[in-house]
Amino acid sequence: MTFLEEILAQKAVEVAEMPLEQVAEKRKTYSFYDFLKENTEQMQLIAEVKRASPSKGEINMDVNPVAQAKSYEAAGAGMISVLTDPIFFKGSIEDLREVAKNVAIPVLCKDFIISEKQLIRARNAGATVVLLIISALTEDELALLFKQASALDLEVLVEVHDRDELALAQKIGAKLIGVNNRNLHTFEVDIAVSEMVANDFSTEACFISESGFKTADDVNRVSKEFNAVLVGEALMRDKTPQKAAESLKVKR
């Protein structure tokens, strides 16, 4: 069983037990898509709160999510990503709720979303952007969840790992497309994935390169084709996350 298969099997159990919440008022912040379109001179940063991962194990279990997020915001991050998976990433929806209460910028719910219940829960907790991972969904499931998220006035970051998945993301009209440099079946990371997939960019979407970034030189590799990078582990391991985040803001 691959990492992804194991995660999805557990996620089905988690979602089956999850209550269906009533839709509450949406948190007010700016559109991340509009922000990226308006701020093109620099590579923008999605900075992540992540305690652990299936491949690396514990990364920073003692982190204060709010303090970490506020450091990112002070560094000029355009959005905070919060892992909410409790089993494999040691996150929680409460982490997201607390972060969203304490920052002004958009918050991304980073999880393996397979149900509308998760979309509503994320919105109610303060997320204004949600992640849909193409490799975790059938084409019909992706289309339905994309429609449901849009109906909830959530922005959708559609994650791809290869050219076929990119074609599907562009076909459904995704405005935010993330290229994950991590293979979710093996969890191996290679920034060259983004460099390769970028050859097929053909829409008015904004593009985010995800995973594997540790230095400004890493970010420079994708700065021409991408609008932003998503960085988690490198920032979570650094004792001075604000400085670490600032160091990744390079010119495009």
UniProtKB/Swiss-Prot annotation:
It holds the Pfam family IGPS. It is an enzyme of class 4 (lyase). It catalyses: 1-(2-carboxyphenylamino)-1-deoxy-D-ribulose 5-phosphate + H(+) = (1S,2R)-1-C-(indol-3-yl)glycerol 3-phosphate + CO2 + H2O. Keywords: Amino-acid biosynthesis, Aromatic amino acid biosynthesis, Decarboxylase, Lyase, Tryptophan biosynthesis. GO terms for molecular function: indole-3-glycerol-phosphate synthase activity; phosphoribosylanthranilate isomerase activity. GO terms for biological process: L-tryptophan biosynthetic process. Pathway: Amino-acid biosynthesis; L-tryptophan biosynthesis; L-tryptophan from chorismate: step 4/5. Its EC number is 4.1.1.48. NCBIfam families: PRK00278.1-3 (NF001371), PRK00278.2-4 (NF001377). Belongs to the TrpC family. HAMAP family: IGPS_B. This is Indole-3-glycerol phosphate synthase. The gene is trpC.
